[in-house]
Amino acid sequence: MILIKKILILEDNLLILSKILAKLEIVEQDQPYLLSLVILTDFQQVEDYINNNPKANNFDIIILDRDCKLGGSFHNLNFERFGTDKVISISAVPEYNNEAKKRGVKRVILKDLKYKDEFADKVATEVRRMISPQRLFNLKLR
């Protein structure tokens, strides 16, 4: 049996995205799961392919930026449908991360455009925590 964790990444900065992907590749090597990724780079894609698609409802993790180069916001994602416990907010603007918190998001990593590698490390660490078999084992014991 193949174990898969599905991750939705909403990020339009391709350099940041490449850093996150490089770190997720390392995470995948340390886990019993394959990582299945869906990457969207504009807010209209979120509306068309996620919010309005009844089949797009099974993500384990959502990595969520806020701003989109098209002038919209990735916060158009239907948080309630997917569950705020699955979301990692990664805006470089503290106010935008606070917006996500007000909607129930608990995991926030301030994007640091000066220290991109360190930022990507933090994202990968949070993903690792969220998919860790030990975490799943602990949840089942409660």
Language-model segments: residues:
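Two-component/phosphorelay signaling modules centered on CheY-like receiver
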Residues: 14-41
